Amino acid sequence: MKLPEKKVKKLIGMMNSLTQVKIPPMKPILEIFDMAMDEKTLDYLLRVGTEEHTLRDLKKLYIRMYGRADYDANWENFWKEIYEMSFLIPGEEDSEKFLLATIFPGWIELSVSGPLNKKRAAIIEKFMTFWDLLRKVNIAPIRMLTDMQGMRELKTNEPHMSTFLSTGKKAVPLNEPLTSEHQVRTAGDVYELLARHKDQLSVMNCICRTHKQISGGGDCEYGLPIEGCINIGPLSRQLVDNGISRRLTYEEACNLIEDFEKKGCIHTLFHYGSSTDKEAINICNCCNDCCLLYSSYQKGYISKVFVKSFYSPQMIDESRCTGCNKCGKYCATGATYYDKEAKKLVFDYDSCVGCGQCVTQCAFDVRKMVPDERPVFAKTRKRA
């Protein structure tokens, strides 16, 4: 059904107020809300607002809005739908309370990342029509303006994401928050995080790889499975209850991380409100083939690669390089590759996000990763 647009835009504004990632109320997004909820749910969420609530409080609100008779007849199914769609998720401060979810990252991928059905497939396809606009608007004037904005933010704002090495065992203290949207940590750090939440771990389908398959793109060229996003903490419990996620033991989660590591993943941590000064709730294992962030960047979508990097590669001995170009295949931003004509390695420091895959995938110890904290904005490429 088509929802009242004014109400939907108000809810979008409320959800956007809880995150650094603002999703504009464009037509595909409005249509996703039409597909995902009815007006009764919309009205209820508008009344819930942006504060955290206990389940008891949420029940009382429903009774005030619709009456005791309606509550007795309909509350159970009404709550089941809200819970399963992840419109409300466990609060950050108190996991026994519930908080309005953000849009993306948020309830869109949380609601569609279980076993595929028609509704989930339709929402994914509709969201990708929104995401594709980032490519359609990549024309010279807009590309220039967005790059100028990105360079200004590089000097004045905190980055949207953080990247750590994707290999190695040196731990970065997990109690030191980073003021950015997402973190990408070393495999060693990820193991430490998994251990901290070892009783609340699960894995769900990756929305990016799911879309590639249903749109006819086939399997991930890096051999990564559809099940690729690891959930941690109270949200993991909710997603298991919903049938979205599959529960994992600590050992199973570590084995997945090890496998993803070898295949070239960047371990990206998502947090409440896409802000790393808040608790982590999800580890997305990104690749260059399927990932909305990196694959889209390489194909010429308006760049969303604005990260805080903590490492960069340093040359040990370039004469060891055999020209295999594995570094180029696994580099997320094209910052390094082997130039066959010049017969040398190319490296663009300004585009390097410090993921470490150029070192991980190299069998000849040509480079090593060294500490180097800096913001990075990868300028938009021309459309492929």
Regions found by a protein language model. Name each.
Residues 1-31:
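Long, low-complexity, charged/polar intrinsically disordered regions in eukaryotic proteins
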Residues 35-41:
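Short helix-coil-helix linker/hinge
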Residues 35, 67-70, 98-100, 270-282, ...:
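Ferredoxin-like iron-sulfur electron-transfer modules
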Residues 68-84:
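Short amphipathic alpha-helical interaction segments
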Residues 80-95, 336-337, 367-368:
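A short, conserved structural fragment
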Residues 139-310:
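Catalytic cores of enzyme domains
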Residues 51-65:
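Short acidic, hydrophobic short linear motifs in intrinsically disordered regions
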Residues 95-137:
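Short, amphipathic alpha-helical interaction segments positioned at domain boundaries
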